[in-house]
Amino acid sequence: MMMPAEELEALARAEPVVHDEADGRRRRGNATRESILQAAADLASVEGLEGLTIGRLATELEMSKSGLFAHFGSKEELQLATIDAARRRFVEHVVKPSRSLPRGRERLEALINDWLAYFRSEQFDGGCFFHTVKAEFDSRPDNAVREVVMEDVRQFLGLLSREVRKAQEAGDLDPTVDPEQLAFELDALGTAVNSGWQLHEDSAVFDRGRRAIARRLEVEATEAGRAALAAAAP
């Protein structure tokens, strides 16, 4: 069974599917669905997932409810599909770019820097989609939508932990450091950057966040890791 963090990496490695002309109608239908889901994710990033209904989205897109029902049979199905679309956008902008780098501290830092850049680029109208829905569902009763949201949060934390381990295996970070603890601290720093940006629109938080993260990693770096990072610097 694939571990959660590996699912994010698998998405990042996935190649686009090539269709022949016989699939033209299906491709057009998929393109329409993707456009709807992009709008749904933007709307949910502002208003939350609970307010995302077939009727609300139909009003936003100036479409008929029956037209949306052709793509999504229920509110829950729409919500789950919206989370999936947001996840794919997150993987494309945050997880995928650093996959070509060798395992180690450089790749870990690149992953985190891409995460911070994703916050700043505001891929969604309301800022980070997952920051919004995580806060929304934090105290909600368990249901299918909440479980998927919480699993996505766990996946990214797991990915950070895996990258810390790989940096340890590469000799860049102290092997006695607890990967889960360091991943937790890195996640907390990144989340603080996003909160500062969303609440105060203070761009200085990005530089502060990068410096804080770099210092935290420097504390746990090995001498060999410091030398390798210095050699790789432009």
Where do the PLM segments sit?
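Basic, helix-initiating cap at the start of DNA-binding domains
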Residues: M1-E47, G51-E60, E77-L80
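Key DNA-contact positions within bacterial/archaeal DNA-binding proteins
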Residues: S66
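An amphipathic alpha-helix adjacent to DNA-recognition modules
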Residues: N30-Q38, S45, E50-G51, E62, ...
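Short, solvent-exposed amphipathic helices
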Residues: R89, D125, A144-Q155, R162
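Hydrophobic alpha-helical connector segments
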Residues: A81, V95-G126, P179-L186, G225-A232
